[in-house]
Amino acid sequence: VERALLNWETMVGTSDIGIGFPEMYLLDDMNNNLNLYRKKSPITYANNIITPTLIIHSEKDYRCPVEQAEQLFSNLKRRGVDTTMIRFPDESHELSRSGKPNHRIQRFESIIDWHKKQLT
């Protein structure tokens, strides 16, 4: 899971595009249809996740704020799901494309290491 939108409800108040973005995709206002926002939010279904999960997120991601990842991470950890969260300080939503070279390498190596661990 990387730079993910996991909760439409909290995205509204925390994302740099949060005010109009959800309405554009969900075609309804949160005040009119909160149930729709919850139904379309992956975090609503997080209790069904049992698969080991790697979460990668940048601390200065203002598009999909880090709190989105923290919600999933805390849910999985509380329930004992094998979960790792890697946070990149001073990186934005663009980490994989234009982040600092050492962070892009670290990100890539973390993904490879995670898969090696899970496949052995």
What are these regions (language model features)?
Residues 1-120:
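Active-site-proximal cap/loop segments of hydrolase catalytic domains
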